[in-house]
UniProtKB/Swiss-Prot annotation:
Protein name: Large ribosomal subunit protein uL14c
Gene it is expressed from: rpl14
Example of a GO MF term: large ribosomal subunit rRNA binding
Keyword rRNA-binding applies: yes
UniProt-listed Pfam families: Ribosomal_L14 (PF00238)
Function: Binds to 23S rRNA.
Top-level taxonomic group: Eukaryota
Family the entry assigns: Belongs to the universal ribosomal protein uL14 family.
GO biological process: translation
Compartment annotation: Plastid
Keywords: Plastid, Ribonucleoprotein, Ribosomal protein, RNA-binding, rRNA-binding
The keyword Transcription regulation appears for this protein: no
C-alpha cells in the first residue's frame, strides 16, 4: 500500500529514478494500490533526460510489496519493491520501455498500451 511520503522506484526510461508520493488522485482512500494514479515529486533523476529532479509528475503504480489477490485463480502475487511509471495527463506513457514485470490487472482497467511496451506481463 502506498501512502503519502512513500518512496517508489521508477520502472521506465523517462529519466526519473526515485519518486515520492505527495497525493493520491484516483481514489479517496488514504492509500493506493496497483493500478492507482498518484501525484509525485522526483527525488532522483538521471542527467540529460526529459524528467528532472524536483519536478511534479503523475505516476501509475505497477508494483507493490503488499500482496495482490487474483480472483480468477485464487492466488496472491507480491513484488519485492514498490514501483511506478511516469504518465502524461492523458494517461499515456512518457517513457518507451517498462522494466520488470507488470500485472495483467492493469490491462483490465484501461491501460492497454502497457501491453506493447512491457517486457513481462504476469
Amino acid at each position: 500500500m502506498i501512502q503519502t511520503q512513500t518512496y517508489l522506484n521508477v520502472s521506465d526510461n523517462s529519466g526519473a529514478k526515485k519518486i515520492m508520493c505527495i497525493s493520491i488522485i484516483s481514489t479517496k482512500r488514504k492509500y493506493a494500490k496497483i493500478g492507482d494514479t498518484i501525484i509525485a515529486v522526483v527525488k532522483k533523476a538521471s542527467p540529460n533526460k526529459i524528467i528532472k529532479k524536483s519536478m511534479i509528475v503523475k505516476a501509475l503504480i505497477i508494483r507493490t510489496t503488499k500482496p495482490l489477490y487474483r480472483k480468477h485463480n485464487n492466488m496472491y502475487i507480491s513484488f519485492n519493491e514498490n514501483a511506478a511509471i511516469i504518465i502524461n495527463t492523458d494517461n499515456t506513457l512518457k517513457g518507451t520501455n517498462i522494466f520488470g514485470p507488470v500485472p495483467r490487472e492493469l490491462m483490465n482497467i484501461g491501460f492497454t498500451n502497457l501491453n506493447s511496451t512491457a517486457k513481462l506481463i504476469i
